[in-house]
């Protein structure tokens, strides 16, 4: 069984992609709606949440974990790899590979929670793959609550996104 966790429902897109790619595999998804958003919490708290989520999924029978939360992956991935003896994947590495492969100018914009941006994980991984890349990072603390509330197509969300993306 594959266990997938996120701080909310955004990781359902990851679960859907895994289900399409591996239809014979059983999945369990844990969206931590009780403690979302993670992005404004301390690294210690985020790591503890990720540890608890991973253990919960293992207790349910998961033999492989996917961290579908950028914030948890950026802060706790190394700890989870050290502490748990099973395959653990995260969403950052494939996103970085796609960004590096897609950019024509060598410029890559990254948006995320404060914790994700402050971890510098995207910049480190992008520059490891493309040493001449220029990375422009922008924290977007209001984005997670808007997405979780289903406000993707609202005028207010578009205004906030324009504001966040203008420096990029």
Residue ranges of model-derived segments:
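Non-catalytic structural scaffold of enzyme domains
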Residues: 1-168
